[in-house]
């Protein structure tokens, strides 16, 4: 790789990391190319980005964004994206499927370095869509209850009329 290519990679990663909500560093030692491509495909479907990059170049890009505590050693694949819960879920699920060859090392979430256990904890949180559904349910509950109260007298009246009809028929 020439110096200018390295500078382009650092510039690209610096910009990407600046816009990312979270970054995860994973060890992929022993993974086949098809498994790594599978990770890339899954990540792309979820709006995440995956890149295997030299540690020194990634460290420069991270430091350009003020991330000092992030240490890269051995083989690393970096995964990043805008939705930290989706990122954590994707990486955790992939790590469970490929236990022998893929391990979560660390992450950078909300301005701090996170270990694998913290990333796994994030993966158990509800997704943005699930949270919106819960919020919508909370907002609509009072309206549903009000409609039920308004409809109750009508339903009771119909029930009383039905009972009277049945008594007269008997």
From Swiss-Prot:
State the Gene Ontology BP annotations.
Answer: translation
One cellular component term (GO) for this entry is:
large ribosomal subunit
What Gene3D superfamilies has UniProt attached to this entry? 3.30.70.1730, 6.10.250.290
Which keywords does this Swiss-Prot/TrEMBL entry list?
Ribonucleoprotein, Ribosomal protein, RNA-binding, rRNA-binding
Give any Pfam family that matches.
Ribosomal_L10
Q: Which GO terms describe its molecular function?
A: large ribosomal subunit rRNA binding; structural constituent of ribosome
PROSITE patterns recorded: RIBOSOMAL_L10
Protein role: Forms part of the ribosomal stalk, playing a central role in the interaction of the ribosome with GTP-bound translation factors.
Subunit structure, briefly?
Answer: Part of the ribosomal stalk of the 50S ribosomal subunit. The N-terminus interacts with L11 and the large rRNA to form the base of the stalk. The C-terminus forms an elongated spine to which L12 dimers bind in a sequential fashion forming a multimeric L10(L12)X complex.
Which PANTHER family does this UniProt record tie to the protein? 39S RIBOSOMAL PROTEIN L10, MITOCHONDRIAL
Q: Indicate the family of this protein.
A: Belongs to the universal ribosomal protein uL10 family.
Listed name of the protein: Large ribosomal subunit protein uL10
Q: Give the originating organism.
A: Nitratiruptor sp. (strain SB155-2)
In the UniProt record, what gene is named as encoding this protein?
A: rplJ
